[in-house]
Amino acid sequence: MAAAAAEEGMEPRALQYEQTLMYGRYTQDLGAFAKEEAARIRLGGPEPWKGPPSSRAAPELLEYGRSRCARCRVCSVRCHKFLVSRVGEDWIFLVLLGLLMALVSWVMDYAIAACLQAQQWMSRGLNTSILLQYLAWVTYPVVLITFSAGFTQILAPQAVGSGIPEMKTILRGVVLKEYLTLKTFIAKVIGLTCALGSGMPLGKEGPFVHIASMCAALLSKFLSLFGGIYENESRNTEMLAAACAVGVGCCFAAPIGGVLFSIEVTSTFFAVRNYWRGFFAATFSAFIFRVLAVWNRDEETITALFKTRFRLDFPFDLQELPAFAVIGIASGFGGALFVYLNRKIVQVMRKQKTINRFLMRKRLLFPALVTLLISTLTFPPGFGQFMAGQLSQKETLVTLFDNRTWVRQGLVEELEPPSTSQAWNPPRANVFLTLVIFILMKFWMSALATTIPVPCGAFMPVFVIGAAFGRLVGESMAAWFPDGIHTDSSTYRIVPGGYAVVGAAALAGAVTHTVSTAVIVFELTGQIAHILPVMIAVILANAVAQSLQPSLYDSIIRIKKLPYLPELGWGRHQQYRVRVEDIMVRDVPHVALSCTFRDLRLALHRTKGRMLALVESPESMILLGSIERSQVVALLGAQLSPARRRQHMQERRATQTSPLSDQEGPPTPEASVCFQVNTEDSAFPAARGETHKPLKPALKRGPSVTRNLGESPTGSAESAGIALRSLFCGSPPPEAASEKLESCEKRKLKRVRISLASDADLEGEMSPEEILEWEEQQLDEPVNFSDCKIDPAPFQLVERTSLHKTHTIFSLLGVDHAYVTSIGRLIGIVTLKELRKAIEGSVTAQGVKVRPPLASFRDSATSSSDTETTEVHALWGPHSRHGLPREGSPSDSDDKCQ
């Protein structure tokens, strides 16, 4: 029974997150479940089953008296008040956040470097045997990746992937269950360390944004124990925005680029009041991160992470700008291709049902096979010698940013034997062939590796590929102009490292659709000499990539089916002529103020949305407010609850025994008690409120209809009602209902609960036909909404609102639906689904009135149709002294709404 109850208790959680082979996937009713849970808790519904009761000490033993703990708590509270009064709560939070993230980043880098050194040590120690060296080279990353995938899957599947797409969704207002918890933080940190320590082409920046956000959420919960602003949940969003900047800042020691990058990838509209928070926390975190490197004697002083030494007097010539522009345009196409390839890999694996089902049963097989393939191809004595397979990502960037020219004669003799630059010039190949093979192989390897179900990002692999492409162009320019470019009797040699910097920023910007990668590159290299070529290449790459594909993070949002709102895009002027009346759904699920419970049940059958519109009457359709689905379910469940049926039975029994009695309530039954064997599961307490309790715990109920009925005394699960179950399973005929009830009774023979019951309970059994008749009578009664929490001012739009203004409002306010009204009359509803289809140009004709091509040929001088005008006149009233308001043009209505 405990195992069954545990399985039922875990069932609602599966509605939030669905683990797939590569990426996880969230369902469409993501925020609805969280709000239903909040409504259940607020209304005092039954708690989910959490296992057998544990033997805890008495509550009085947990109270603190005059002990040392009490004195420590008083002292900590006084210190907190002193610091808050002198420094301020925001500064304390941001300092702690920056310090913790710097420590986490430095410890992770130290562990990753140790893992990579261990792999190199094993490979060099077994160089006498190629077979043993290959086995060591392949087994090491396979073990680490398998452990990372298994550990993440067991502890917190939400830790899989980058984290930036989910943070973008969370900052928009969507609630993702268990995404910012402690166990997800542990799974993300350990899983990311093992994944990066394996040497796979994976990144750190995206997961670190998620780690910083989790750290900020946990820190807010901890500091809320002391009171203050941390108890305000609306403040958490501002702290999460600052945490995203800290994640990038302490990852690359790039505070300015980190703040700008976090704003670009997570926000559509950014609150300027959070600007200083991000800069302060990111700067402090980057400072501590580099100080720890100096303390560990990794660096002599605080320097850039990949310091370059380009010449400053003449870094590039004006004639080289076309080459930089070519890098930007090519990077734009390459970034779009990378996003397309990454999404196509996931879609192909999902469409192959047989392979997908097999790999879903063997979850660790897919990451192991991918790691085995990539490790085999990068084996240094094998094919890896033609793509610098022995170099890590950090060593690869250091060599690619080198300002020396590799194709110059005599370079190999000048390089020292242990130099890592020799990896790009193997004995049986040249620099150009090695760079081409490296770019092609790393391109599809990175797109494939980022689909492994482990914590990983794609920024750093793309950054390295872009640097290699820029280096290829730079080496080609150096080969074409071996003596450099002559300018005013002066000769300046080509610097291939500058081309690598430009290529890295351009390709990373094309994949992420950001311009701040240019600033990140400047902070990474410590030089700003190539600012003009970098900006030109990044802008051109973004222009090309944004016209072809969405960003990598938006692509993952679509793969995971997270709620999102696409951008309007460029050059689509017809979108500015589309109005809300062209895209709204006219068949709005609603309930009237004078409706019956049968109407409530029909409304719940018609829609799966989390909100229902409340109107005055079906004729007038005057919008009075909105009511949550959980509230409607609670009303219907209370009307058909076992408590009401028990009361009905007692009243009928009282009428039969004493028909001449004038008492309104039923008489108290006799107190004779006997044992009752109950074979049904129930989520409610016994009918009698005495100290007698069942000897075995009741099983948790499955349907969500009875969640909010915990305060009413109820009976068995059979008394939940056939009509109530038909809300989710359809309305069966009486014969089928009785057969189903009998089969359920046979299946529940093993679920025995011994309890104490009165003789009145034993005599009050109703047949299924009587239950159906009683429920039909209850469904015909009118609904009383006085006990419901109704939103009296739901968000509304008028039918003449433009698509551009609607998109801006949805983005700014973070709403997911809006009712469309005309002089208070409900005429439609617009949700994220309709808005997304209108923007993407794929509006269907199901319930949506669209005039192709999206009302672009609408006559702006024409008003509404005759039917609508007649209805508005009738609603306005024939005896009104004022005339009907004139309907202006779209531009006029937009100006008035501003």
UniProtKB/Swiss-Prot annotation:
UniProt keywords, alphabetically: Acetylation, CBS domain, Cell membrane, Cell projection, Chloride, Chloride channel, Disease variant, Epilepsy, Ion channel, Ion transport, Membrane, Phosphoprotein, Postsynaptic cell membrane, Repeat, Synapse, Transmembrane, Transmembrane helix, Transport, Voltage-gated channel
Outcome of swapping M22K: In HALD2; increased voltage-gated chloride currents due to higher channel open probabilities at physiological cell membrane potentials
Modes of activity regulation: Common gate kinetics are down-regulated by intracellular ATP. Inhibited by AK-42, a derivative of meclofenamate. Inhibited by Cd(2+). Inhibited by Zn(2+) and PKC activation. Inhibited at acidic pH. CCLN2:HEPACAM channel conductance is up-regulated upon hypo-osmolarity.
Region of interest (Essential for channel gating by both voltage and cell volume), ranges: 16-34
Recorded topology in the membrane: Multi-pass membrane protein
Domain CBS: 584-642, 790-850
Domain of life: Eukaryota
Result for mutant: R725W: Slightly faster channel activation
Reactions listed under catalytic activity: chloride(in) = chloride(out); thiocyanate(in) = thiocyanate(out); bromide(in) = bromide(out); nitrate(in) = nitrate(out)
InterPro entries (alphabetical): CBS_dom_sf, Cl-channel-2, Cl-channel_core, Cl_channel_volt-gated, ClC
Tissue expression per record: Ubiquitously expressed. Moderately expressed in aortic and coronary vascular smooth muscle cells and expressed at a low level in aortic endothelial cells. Expressed in the adrenal gland, predominantly in the zona glomerulosa. Expressed in white mater perivascular astrocytes and ependymal cells (at protein level).
Stretches in topological domain Cytoplasmic: 2-87, 549-898
Residue(s) carrying Phosphothreonine: T20
Record: disease: Epilepsy, idiopathic generalized 11: A disorder characterized by recurring generalized seizures in the absence of detectable brain lesions and/or metabolic abnormalities. Generalized seizures arise diffusely and simultaneously from both hemispheres of the brain. Juvenile absence epilepsy 2: A subtype of idiopathic generalized epilepsy characterized by onset occurring around puberty, absence seizures, generalized tonic-clonic seizures (GTCS), GTCS on awakening, and myoclonic seizures.
Protein name: Chloride channel protein 2
Organism, as annotated: Homo sapiens (Human)
Gene: CLCN2
